[in-house]
Swiss-Prot record:
Protein name (database record): NAD(P)H-quinone oxidoreductase subunit L
GO CC terms in record: plasma membrane-derived thylakoid membrane
Biological source species: Trichormus variabilis (strain ATCC 29413 / PCC 7937)
Location of the protein in the cell: Cellular thylakoid membrane
Function: NDH-1 shuttles electrons from an unknown electron donor, via FMN and iron-sulfur (Fe-S) centers, to quinones in the respiratory and/or the photosynthetic chain. The immediate electron acceptor for the enzyme in this species is believed to be plastoquinone. Couples the redox reaction to proton translocation, and thus conserves the redox energy in a proton gradient. Cyanobacterial NDH-1 also plays a role in inorganic carbon-concentration.
Reaction(s) catalysed (UniProt annotation): a plastoquinone + NADH + (n+1) H(+)(in) = a plastoquinol + NAD(+) + n H(+)(out); a plastoquinone + NADPH + (n+1) H(+)(in) = a plastoquinol + NADP(+) + n H(+)(out)
Amino acid sequence: MIVPLLYLALAGAYLLVVPVALMFYLKQRWYVVSSVERTFMYFLVFLFFPGLLVLSPFVNLRPRPRKIEV
């Protein structure tokens, strides 16, 4: 009984928890990273790609509209 729960917890972490944290990390650091950190970010995206793909329909990464004052 413990083995299926362990598999479920690991699958949930791999497909949901870590990709959500990774998306927040990428959104905060994308424009201010060094080249070494960017390589690490690419590695994390490659490693957690299935989870990012699962979450992609629910994420809006488009820039916010600008406020133009007249």
